[in-house]
Regions:
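Donor nucleotide-sugar recognition loop
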Residues: 242-250
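Short glycine/serine/threonine-enriched helix-capping/active-site loop
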Residues: 56, 111, 179-182
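A recurrent flexible, glycine/aromatic-enriched loop bordering the glycosyltransferase active site
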Residues: 212-232
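Conserved donor-nucleotide/metal-binding helix-loop-beta segment in metal-dependent transferases, i.e.
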Residues: 160-182
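Short beta-strand-to-loop element that shapes/binds the nucleotide-sugar donor at the catalytic cleft/hinge
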Residues: 175-198
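Short beta-strand-to-loop acidic/aromatic patch adjacent to the donor-nucleotide binding site
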Residues: 139-159
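Active-site-proximal specificity loops/subdomain of glycosyltransferases
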Residues: 5-8, 66-146
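N-proximal low-complexity "stem/linker" segments adjacent to membrane-targeting elements
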Residues: 1-52, 56-62
Length: 250
């Protein structure tokens, strides 16, 4: 883990050096957000202590103006709803916010303002890696009790058992590298704007399940979903594979 953090982690982890000593959490989740509304800031799934959401608001240098405006609105929503706990050194893009209504803090990562945007070929993988690297650093510092880096997206509705499912695993279990949460595209009928969107969503989910079914039929050891928004990664194994790929998804 130390080798990964020293040689391969993103530079945002260096800004954590000034984090107050008394701050710690039970669980962590990483959310890369681009062009999202603030609806996902609702009450998080419960855990035995406080949870930490690492929110990486991001856009590429080629992003349209409307994307920049939506990202700024999301950052403003965090700053208005939550109480500031800590601000990293100027230019680092990190700040920590406490939810006054839930046992949850938000580590806000700015990768969308001028001079902090992702490169043109950077995408959700890059943003997810930034967040996961920060989570790994905090786990290594023993500020986060769980060794699982939970990864999800802003448009995902999480079950109440989200954190508790991983917390049930033995602390000493190091053979399990990742967890895949079951998923479905919910409320498509109510929220879709047209029958074409409904059909496209259903076909997309069918293709995901068909692929895994085909891999299972072929007796492949890789017969599982690899969707960034539905997984949790063991911190040690995350470091062994040198983190998430930086490329855009798709």
């Amino acid at each position: 883990v130390e080798k990964y953090l020293h040689h391969y982690a993103e530079p945002e982890i260096l800004a954590l050096d000034g984090l107050p000593d008394q701050l710690s959490w039970e669980n962590v989740m990483v959310i890369p957000a681009c062009n999202e509304s603030s609806g996902f800031l609702r009450t998080p799934p419960p855990c035995d202590g406080r949870s930490l959401m690492i929110l990486v608001i991001n856009e590429s240098v080629t992003a349209a103006r409307n994307v920049s405006l939506r990202n700024q609105a999301l950052a403003t929503a965090v700053q208005e709803r939550f109480d500031r706990l800590w601000q990293a050194a100027p230019g680092s893009g990190l700040s920590l916010w406490r939810d006054p209504l839930a046992a949850r803090d938000v580590l806000l990562v700015d990768r969308f303002t001028q001079d902090r945007q992702l490169p043109a070929k950077g995408g959700v993988g890059f943003a997810r890696k930034i967040g996961a690297d920060l989570a790994l650093s905090l786990i290594h510092q023993q500020r986060i009790s769980s060794t699982w880096i939970h990864c999800t997206d802003a448009d995902v509705s999480l079950p109440q058992t989200y954190f508790r499912s991983s917390n049930k695993l033995p602390v000493t279990e190091q053979k399990v590298s990742a967890l895949i949460y079951p998923f479905s595209h919910c409320d498509v009928q109510e929220r879709a704007e047209s029958s074409e969107v409904i059909e496209a969503t259903q076909l997309y989910e069918l293709s995901l399940r068909y692929y895994v079914a085909g891999m299972k039929f072929a007796h492949s050891p890789y017969a599982f979903h690899t969707i960034g928004s539905t997984m949790a990664v063991n911190a040690i194994h995350y470091a062994k594979v040198r983190g998430f790929p930086k490329r855009a998804a798709g």
